[in-house]
């Protein structure tokens, strides 16, 4: 089963989760320090103990500096950090 761990369960994190599901990720779970629901399996600092169970992860915070900070942490720990781009996304030829 293709699974993904997302750090950040706010609005941006939920959008990333929907996109990940469109890409074929069957199990998507979150780490978040503030949001509490059934999809949130712990706090952000728990990323260190979740690596074996979820080797693929992304940081999905709206704040760019926070997203970069956590992406660096994930990479240092050895996580695979994929680009999550919706399959229907289109890039302009003039971009």
Predicted regions and their residues:
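Short, intrinsically disordered, charge-balanced linker/junction segments flanking boundaries
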Residues: 93-95
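Phosphate-bearing ligand-interacting subdomains
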Residues: 35-91
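Hydrophobic, well-ordered beta-alpha structural blocks that scaffold small-molecule cofactor pockets
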Residues: 1-51
């Amino acid at each position: 089963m293709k699974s993904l761990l997302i750090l950040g369960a706010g609005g941006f994190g939920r959008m990333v989760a929907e996109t990940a599901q469109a890409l074929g990720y069957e199990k998507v779970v979150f780490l978040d320090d503030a949001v509490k629901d059934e999809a949130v399996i712990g706090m952000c600092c728990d990323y260190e103990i979740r690596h074996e169970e979820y080797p693929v992860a992304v940081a999905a915070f709206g704040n760019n500096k926070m997203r970069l900070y956590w992406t660096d942490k994930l990479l240092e720990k050895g996580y695979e950090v994929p680009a999550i781009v919706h399959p229907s996304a289109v890039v302009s030829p003039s971009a």
